[in-house]
């Protein structure tokens, strides 16, 4: 008995499965034996097929700025009513859904109009779901590469406005009408739908808004009914952390090195120029890296490119300043004359404005040495001419302040001296005059060096202010370049 009961149950199960399969097969033959997938599902030619469209974004893959191409992964939800596929589940043993290949069913041929690679279709032709009552649903996946005009003015603190435009490739506005799908509450889904559980966030771009709009185009004549398309706008904002860490921070640090040239002495013009030129070369490398990232356009210059050009101009001015300061510091009295006005500005006015104390002047520091050397020469001459011991001459010289009497007595004695002695005196006078000229020349050289140093200090503060203010203004422009508040709900709901 037990074995007979098990056999009966097995036969009933197999019979039930075969009946289920036969019902789906019967339904398929019932619907598609006389079905033509090339004809629109309308009873009269003037009728319009209403197409419900819903786009679900699963991944914002990338935005290639250089090629101006947006790559996205989406699901295209398309629904319509086909009266030829109408059936009742009561007639087919409760079968409510029939899955058939997409090539067996009429399709509205919804394509991405602004694609860039010529791939108008979907990535996978999945089955079409035919529901009771003639409702047809198709949800194919697609990876689209669409055009996106990239605005690089505020790169890398920019946001972009990209669009996905869907339309029927074959049918006009009178034959096919595109509308938005509705949610469970009956509200139109007039934006790109994003399921946060299945959405993969992009590491470079954040999606702020993704509204949709249906556009109607009038025909050029009365016989042309026009067209209808659905445009989904993606407002995406760049996440600048990668560029801040890898480009902006190194660029600012390297650019700041050009100011270190002012900490070298004013006479070290060669080393200062070397530092500035090395910074220029480094900035050129950064500019080349940016040029490889952004599109080749002459409509605008990116913010980071403007900053690099600004810093290169500052570095060029610093190189010119180093050359001018070196030229001033190495001047001599034999080649250049110092005007009183220039001395007043560079040696008095500028040091006072910059808080630089002038070097202390000690006029009595060099005079005793010169007087001592002169007295020694005079004593040797008197010892030779007057035939007096040196100790006596020194004793006599101490009775008169600074050797004044000795010099006068020597002049009287030289009147009766021999011509050879006069030659010696002339030689001594020449040596003294040369010494005074050298001391005066040394003072002039010192003044030129001080003027070069004052000019160098002025240029340092000017370059520091220019570099700081210019960098701040340029990057503030990127900071205030925010996505405007649009009258749309956020694309990704928290």
UniProtKB/Swiss-Prot annotation:
**Cytoplasmic compartment spans:** 265-272, 329-457
Catalyses: K(+)(in) = K(+)(out); Na(+)(in) = Na(+)(out)
Would you indicate the residue range of the signal peptide? 1-20
PROSITE patterns in UniProt: NEUROTR_ION_CHANNEL
One annotated GO molecular function is: acetylcholine-gated monoatomic cation-selective channel activity
Q: What is its main location?
A: membrane
Q: By its UniProt entry, which SUPFAM superfamilies does this protein fall under?
A: Neurotransmitter-gated ion-channel transmembrane pore, Nicotinic receptor ligand binding domain-like
Topology with respect to the bilayer: Multi-pass membrane protein
Q: What keywords are assigned to this protein?
A: Cell membrane, Disulfide bond, Glycoprotein, Ion channel, Ion transport, Ligand-gated ion channel, Membrane, Postsynaptic cell membrane, Receptor, Signal, Synapse, Transmembrane, Transmembrane helix, Transport
Entry GO terms, CC: acetylcholine-gated channel complex; neuromuscular junction; neuron projection; plasma membrane; postsynaptic membrane; postsynaptic specialization membrane; synapse
Keyword Transmembrane, does the record have it? yes
- Residues annotated as transmembrane: 240-264, 273-291, 307-328, 458-481
Residue ranges, Extracellular compartment? Answer: 21-239, 292-306, 482-494
One GO BP annotation is: monoatomic ion transmembrane transport
Pfam families for the chain: Neur_chan_LBD, Neur_chan_memb
Record keywords: Membrane included? Answer: yes
Compartments, as annotated in UniProt = Postsynaptic cell membrane; Cell membrane
Give glycosylation sites per the record: 86, 161
Disulfide bridge partners, by residue number: 148-162
The record's function comment reads: After binding acetylcholine, the AChR responds by an extensive change in conformation that affects all subunits and leads to opening of an ion-conducting channel across the plasma membrane.
Could you say which protein family the record assigns here?
Belongs to the ligand-gated ion channel (TC 1.A.9) family. Acetylcholine receptor (TC 1.A.9.1) subfamily. Epsilon/CHRNE sub-subfamily.
Quaternary arrangement and interactors, per the entry?
A: Pentamer of two alpha chains, and one each of the beta, delta, and gamma (in immature muscle) or epsilon (in mature muscle) chains. The muscle heteropentamer composed of alpha-1, beta-1, delta, epsilon subunits interacts with the alpha-conotoxin ImII.
Q: What is this protein called?
A: Acetylcholine receptor subunit epsilon
| Gene symbol of the encoding locus | Chrne
